[in-house]
From Swiss-Prot:
Record PTM Phosphoserine, positions in chain: 658, 662, 767
Gene Ontology terms: biological process: enamel mineralization; intracellular monoatomic cation homeostasis; magnesium ion homeostasis; magnesium ion transport; visual perception
Similarity annotation: Belongs to the ACDP family.
Pfam hit, one: CNNM
Other remarks on this protein: Shares weak sequence similarity with the cyclin family, hence its name. However, it has no cyclin-like function in vivo.
Tree of life domain: Eukaryota
Ranges where the record places region Disordered: 647-676
Taxon lineage: Eukaryota, Metazoa, Chordata, Craniata, Vertebrata
Protein name in the entry: Metal transporter CNNM4
UniProt key word Secreted: no
Expressed in which tissues: Present in spinal cord dorsal horn neurons and in developing teeth (at protein level). In the tooth, higher expression is found in the ameloblasts during the transition and maturation phases of amelogenesis; reduced expression in the odontoblasts.
Organism: Rattus norvegicus (Rat)
């Protein structure tokens, strides 16, 4: 068997290939030179380390080293290795790796390495496992170097391999550096420290600084004491984390080394350290500290501080770097949803009763719910028409409803123009049949509108400001082809918001439903019935009530410019209204509806009076097309008849008049009703100092109205001037009259044109209502 070179490293395959190629060329050259044919021989090309039962490996130079007293498996590569026996392979001792190539003769074979057998030969006879047993070195020796020797036959000469891949170091086995009892004790101590560091890492880092503050304020006395100990070092989160991790890694590494030295086998040392660290260093301590982290952390605070001090040179700079890169530690902060869910999940374990939990939940949901979620739908609201008369029937309906704030609508329920408070009716007599507008405009309560997406917390703040405890919910409707408009959806009250907070319904004697959503009705046990107190249908009211007189007085003083306090004092106006024949009644003849006495004004006939309808309905006919429409109470006509137009002013060119006679207040942007349209337009003309109406007004029902003639009005103006200037004598009446005639003229309007425009507006609105 001839040596052909070899190598024992994976990265030495190119060198071995070159050696193999050189050996084959040398073999062929030898055979060709001899000219003789010889039988094919076994060839060893290389050797490498396969395994051993003790520490072994390869040094940086590629030389195999093994421990003394171990069994080593060497992998051989070559040709026809199945024909090689153990007596053809041996080792010889050499001085050093540098001089091994000086000689190829194996002068003396060593007995320190015993070649056992060649096993596991491959099917192609190109590789096999050589088992070698190493003996112990002498006391004075700590290392020996051996070279591989082979021969071709049992009686042939030994040849020494000269490359480094065929060398083998045998080193002294290192013994334990500590006594066995101390070694075992140190392993146990390190195992305990590993568990402490692992448990503290989980227990302390799981304690949020915010949670520690909460425990300090509301925990038990023991918990407060523990929290006060832990909180200072827990604030230094990254520093504490780095110290615990460095200590844990240091202890686990030391434990592995000690176990390797104690057991001696690499696999057993790794398995033992893994089992010990996992069970006693991770599972048990973390299971304990996850439940009692506060107590464990407080009782081991001294040990933690010691390790923080010992690891300060390394852990503190790393913690500062983490603070710079990652920023400050993000503390646990519960938002609204998480806090609410935490209360629900922990309900079986906390001492909160269901009502308290509902209140907390309701308060937390204020910012997530809108007024549309809790409002009362518009069709379910109790409302009053703006043209309602506060008679006994209306008053009884209001009292039976039980509500203290009632919306007032005009034309349709979505057009809310006022709010009526029940306390406003304290001095209203049902027998007076006072118009509702008189009351609402006298108190002029603000109407509070909110959008449907307003959050409940914002709505509560608005209610707390004291503006109103009732709001109208609206939204912008931009559906369809027309312009966007505000659509009223319903009402929301302070009671609705409070009910949403406490998650319970507040029922009183006025509630009709227990809930706006379920629409479950309340049983009315104590509901009062006022039907027995209502007036008979055939009962007539001959005289005007004081309340109606007051309403007419206030209406004339505030809505009709000719009776404003700047022209006629309120005292004189009241005296004028109490003058005989100023307030009149007209009985309607059902059998002769078009009789002459039903006409208050006749087209193209002179008239010298002003008329204000108090009760009843009239029909107005105007324009070339003879358009007709109906008006009711508090519509007025003939303001131009109260004063003569100047001679130099043509009726065909009137002075423009601002529409200040509307029944709506100036600061409101509301639609006009037919009554307000009729009352806000005075139509007629002045011909030769005499007022001639170009319209007709005919009664449709029994009427009660105020009729003021021109002479009565002029006398009232004169009386007001004399009342304001009591120093004037009778001799100064002429001067007073002159001054009166020189007073600023009230502007007039083209009444027919105005009437036509208002009629078109009424027809357009009626068509819209029919479409809806």
């Amino acid at each position: 068997m001839a040596p052909g070179g070899g190598g024992g490293r994976r990265d030495g395959w190119p060198a071995r290939g070159r050696l193999l190629l050189a050996a084959l060329l040398l073999l062929l050259w030898t055979r060709a030179a001899s000219g003789q044919s010889s039988p094919q021989q076994s060839v060893i090309l290389g050797m490498r380390l396969a395994s051993c039962n003790k520490s072994c490996g390869m040094n940086p130079d590629g030389i195999i080293f093994v421990s003394e007293g171990s069994t080593v498996n060497l992998r051989l590569y070559g040709h026809r290795l199945g024909e090689i026996s153990s007596n053809l392979i041996s080792f010889t001792e050499v001085d050093d790796a540098e001089t091994v190539h000086n000689s190829t003769n194996c002068l003396e074979l060593t007995k320190d390495l015993v070649v056992q057998r060649l096993v596991n030969v491959s099917r192609g006879n190109t590789s096999g496992m050589l088992v070698v047993i190493t003996k112990f070195l002498r006391r004075s020796e700590n290392m020996k170097l051996y070279a591989l020797c082979t021969r071709t036959r049992a009686d042939g000469p030994w040849l020494k391999w000269t490359d480094k891949d065929s060398l083998l170091f045998m080193v002294e086995e290192h013994g334990r550096f500590l006594p066995l009892w101390l070694h075992i004790l140190l392993v146990l101590v390190l195992l305990v420290l590993s568990g402490i560091f692992s448990g503290l890492n989980l227990g302390l880092m799981a304690l949020d600084p915010m949670e520690l503050r909460i425990v300090q304020n509301c925990g038990t006395e023991k918990e407060r004491r523990y929290a006060r100990k832990i909180e200072p070092i827990r604030r230094k989160g990254n520093y504490l984390l780095c110290s615990l991790l460095l200590g844990n890694v240091l202890v686990n590494t030391s434990l592995t080394i000690l176990l390797d030295n104690l057991i001696g086998s690499g696999i057993m040392a790794v398995a033992s350290s893994t089992i010990g660290i996992v069970i006693f260093g991770e599972i048990l301590p973390q299971a304990l500290c996850s439940r009692h982290g506060l107590a464990v952390g407080a009782n081991t605070i001294v040990l933690t501080k010691i390790f923080m001090l010992l690891t300060f040179p390394l852990s503190f700079p790393i913690s500062k770097l983490l603070d710079f890169v990652l920023g400050q530690e993000i503390r646990t902060v519960y938002n609204r949803e998480k806090l609410m869910e935490m209360l629900k999940v922990t309900e079986p374990y906390n001492d909160l009763v269901k009502e308290e939990l509902n209140m907390i939940q309701g308060a937390l949901e204020l910012r997530t719910k809108t007024v549309e979620d809790i409002m009362t739908q518009l069709h379910d609201c109790f409302m009053i028409r703006s043209d309602a008369i506060l008679d006994f029937n209306t008053m009884s309906e209001i009292m039976e409803s039980g509500y203290t704030r009632i919306p007032v609508f005009e034309d349709e329920q979505s057009n809310i123009v006022d709010i009526l408070y029940v306390k406003d009716l304290a001095f209203v007599d049902p027998d007076d049949c006072t118009p509702l507008k008189t009351i609402t405009r006298f108190y002029n309560h603000p109407v509070h509108f909110v959008f449907h997406d307003t959050k409940l917390d914002a709505m509560l703040e608005e209610f707390k400001k004291g503006k109103s405890h009732l709001a109208i919910v609206q939204k912008v409707n931009n559906e369809g082809e027309g312009d966007p408009f505000y659509e009223v959806l319903g009402l929301v009250t302070l009671e609705d918001v409070i009910e949403e907070i406490i998650k319970s319904e507040i029922l009183d004697e006025s509630d009709t439903y227990t809930d706006n959503r379920t629409r479950k009705r309340v049983s009315m046990k104590n509901k009062r019935d006022f039907s027995a107190f209502k007036d008979a249908d055939n009962e007539l009211k001959v005289k005007i009530s004081p309340q109606l007189l007051l309403a007419a007085h206030r209406f004339l003083a505030t809505e009709v410019p000719q009776f404003s306090p700047s022209l006629m004092s309120e005292k004189i106006l009241l005296r004028l209204l109490k003058y005989p024949d100023v307030i009149q009644e007209l009985r309607f003849d059902e059998h002769n509806k078009h009789c002459t006495r039903h006409y208050l004004y006749t087209r193209n006939k002179p008239a010298d009076c002003f008329i204000l309808i108090l009760q009843g309905k009239v029909e107005v006919e105007a324009g070339k097309e003879n358009m007709k429409f109906e008006t009711g109470a508090f519509s007025y006509y003939g303001t131009m008849a109260l004063s003569l137009a100047p001679p130099d002013r043509s009726p065909a060119h009137p002075t423009p008049l601002s529409r200040s006679a509307s029944l709506s207040y100036p600061d409101r942007n509301t639609d006009m009703t037919p009554s307000s349209l009729a009352g806000s337009n005075q139509f007629g003309s002045c011909i030769l100092g005499q007022y001639v109406s170009d319209f007709s007004v005919r009664a449709l029902t029994d009427l009660q109205y105020i009729k003021v003639t021109r002479q009565q009005y002029q006398n009232g103006l004169l009386a007001s001037r004399m009342d304001n200037s009591p120093q004037l004598t009778l001799d100064g009446c002429a001067t007073c009259t002159e001054n009166l005639s020189e007073r600023p003229e009230l502007p007039v309007v083209d009444e027919t044109t105005t009437l036509l425009n208002e009629r078109n507006l009424l027809l357009h609105r009626a068509s819209q209502e029919g479409t809806i």
